[in-house]
Amino acid sequence: VAAPVGAQAADFAFQGAHIFPESFVQTGQNLEEWAKRVSEASNGRITFNIVHGGALLSLGDHLDGIAGGLVDVTSFYPIYFPGEFQVEGALTNIIDIWSEEAPDLEGVTHIHSTLHKEFPAFAAEYENRNMQMLLPLPADPYVIACKTEVKSLADLEGRKMRTFGRYFPILQQHLGVEPLTVPGPEAYQALATGLVDCVYSTPDWIYSNSLHEVAPHVFIPAPERARPQLFATAVVAMNVNSFNKLPDDLKQIVLDVSEDMKGYIGQSMEKVYDTALDNLSKANGATRNYMSAEDLATWAERTPNLLDQAAADLTAAGYPGDEIIARYRELAAAYIAGEWPAKQ
């Protein structure tokens, strides 16, 4: 619950929901921080009561819940609804292994927000479900956790790996593994029974779900830090009717707080990545190895460039796919070069 101490009675008391535990930083703690900042900036005129842990909305119904106004605000995962969020869903399911360098999580947050503003196709997907996207919430970068140690690309050959989504199976197939679709809640059992040998996910998710108990061997698919997805997998989203109840000054406060938090969000998730990797290293028999630059180049060379594929797929579906991907690449290059966004 976010409300400043000693504030006046709220003019707008909004209901929030979160499908995972509050302790989950990406979409729990960051949602609470956003709500706290909005409440403080409005001097208590806006307050939030956020119910965590799927007690109010679950993974399967949190889209209908926010769209239908059961709640006013939520951490929404477009990655779980690729049919309705085709544009956003494409970019959340790709990791750029073809460029020499990729943006960090702060860069992901800035790029996600900017493309939303520049291409109406993104906002239209939210408007179709009566939502407004306010703040991207990127995941910590994906790593590989296996039941036995992995030191190189060759060690992955023939292993079975959990997958999901449209583009991840392609990325994983060219690691030399056999991708198998396994729902997240079943990952532990799938590893324990040998249905899969490895998972490909964020270190925080791996640790939070205790997968390190059965898969303590971490392989970072990069020479140093793992690379993030092109887009955030989740966002702070508000029901449009709820947002429109606010007078203009309070609407602006919500928008300003969301804009100002982009740097904070990226930095908080970089810390989550580091902390989770440290936690995974404490597992019994744990190992951690890194993909060599040579293996990364080999992986990229034998994998179709999924940014190009996404551009073609989006164009075929009637979206400005070529323009979106070209602009993504332009912003990513400018961010990496330190030329964008302008330092304040």
Show the residue positions of the predicted features:
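N-terminal secretory/targeting leader peptides
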Residues: 8-107, 121-344
